[in-house]
């Protein structure tokens, strides 16, 4: 019986060793799987965080843009008033009363221009060369003093808010 007992103990020891090896292999596999899952979750987190930051930046940019151009329609409507004030200032005056009225209109025009400028409305600077982004060609004329494509005459001033044109400068262009 002692041999049988010895054999059983050896078998039990072998089984115990095999079981420990299997447990260690299982632990390694589980550890590897968990490590892999952790890496995947880290990657997902980083991507989600980057996407969130991009959305946040885009929303901020859209907010700033909306604020910058919120008054665009209103400012565009006021340009007709500006044109009328400029026309009134350009009228020839003969008598003292007309000169005083013209002076008052000029003061009003100056104040009006300052308020428009304060809110980002700016006159489009006169350019010699026709630029379709800033100008609207009303007609083409023959001109000995201008090269083809040059602005000959400004018919109506143009304005912009920041980098957006709210009314192009209306011009005649040399052929």
From Swiss-Prot:
UniProt main location, coarse: cytoplasm
Segments crossing the lipid bilayer: none
Compositional bias per record (Basic and acidic residues), positions renumbered to this chain: 25-35
GO MF assignments: adenyl-nucleotide exchange factor activity; protein homodimerization activity; protein-folding chaperone binding; unfolded protein binding
InterPro entries: GrpE (IPR000740), GrpE_coiled_coil (IPR013805), GrpE_head (IPR009012)
Location in or out of the cell: Cytoplasm
Keywords of the record: Chaperone, Cytoplasm, Stress response
Any one GO biological process: protein folding
GO cellular component: cytosol
Start and end residues of each stretch annotated as Disordered: 1-35
Function noted in UniProt: Participates actively in the response to hyperosmotic and heat shock by preventing the aggregation of stress-denatured proteins, in association with DnaK and GrpE. It is the nucleotide exchange factor for DnaK and may function as a thermosensor. Unfolded proteins bind initially to DnaJ; upon interaction with the DnaJ-bound protein, DnaK hydrolyzes its bound ATP, resulting in the formation of a stable complex. GrpE releases ADP from DnaK; ATP binding to DnaK triggers the release of the substrate protein, thus completing the reaction cycle.
Family classification: Belongs to the GrpE family.
Assembly with partners or alone: Homodimer.
NCBIfam families listed in its UniProt record: PRK14140.1 (NF010738), PRK14159.1 (NF010756)
HAMAP family in the record: GrpE (MF_01151)
Designated name of the protein: Protein GrpE
Gene: grpE
